[in-house]
Amino acid sequence: MRIQGINHLLFSVKCLERSIEFYKKALGAKLLVKGRTTAYFDLQGIWLALNEEPDIPRNEIHQSYTHIAFTVGEEEMEEAYERLAGLGVNILKGRPRDPRDRQSIYFTDPDGHKFEFHCGTLNDRLDYYREAKPHMTFFDD
């Protein structure tokens, strides 16, 4: 078996209507279908699904660094920040960052799922780590 890529992303949400508005306005996702407790979007070719599950505890989600990062052009980072701020999105304080590691904006959806807009690539990150973090071990093919 060979993994061919990510098939879809699904998030459990407390309020489907509130989350639909967030994903449409904050991420520009196109709503494809909405049911009583589920919604499907097209997010720049990514299948994004929401399931309304109002009774699931969500306390621990705020303590985790787990997140999904989307690529945004470096020239669009300020516009992305202003868009999120204008929508009243919860923008998180990012970690201290070396300029070689490029820019990021961290934020949450209404249920606390963390997202990042990042303008760097994996190779940018690896090059930076090779220069700045001698304690790391790299495994090249």
From Swiss-Prot:
Q: Where is the active site?
A: 116 (proton donor/acceptor)
Gene Ontology terms, cellular component aspect? cytoplasm
Q: What is its EC number?
A: 2.5.1.-
Q: Does the keyword DNA damage apply?
A: no
Query: Which keywords belong to this entry?
Result: Antibiotic resistance, Cytoplasm, Magnesium, Metal-binding, Transferase
Compartments where located: Cytoplasm
Similarity-based family: Belongs to the fosfomycin resistance protein family. FosB subfamily.
**One biological process GO term for this chain?**
response to antibiotic
Its annotated function is as follows: Metallothiol transferase which confers resistance to fosfomycin by catalyzing the addition of a thiol cofactor to fosfomycin. L-cysteine is probably the physiological thiol donor.
Give the binding site residues for Mg(2+): 8, 67, 116
Molecular functions (GO terms)? magnesium ion binding; transferase activity, transferring alkyl or aryl (other than methyl) groups
Q: How does it assemble?
A: Homodimer.
Cofactor(s) for this protein?
A: Mg(2+)
Native source species: Halalkalibacterium halodurans (strain ATCC BAA-125 / DSM 18197 / FERM 7344 / JCM 9153 / C-125)
Pfam families assigned to the protein according to its UniProt record, in alphabetical order: Glyoxalase
Please state what the protein is called.
Answer: Metallothiol transferase FosB
* InterPro entries named among the record's database cross-references: Fosfomycin_Res_Enzymes, Glyas_Bleomycin-R_OHBP_Dase, Glyas_Fos-R_dOase_dom, Metallothiol_Trafse_FosB, VOC
Specify the VOC domain's residue ranges.
Answer: 5-120
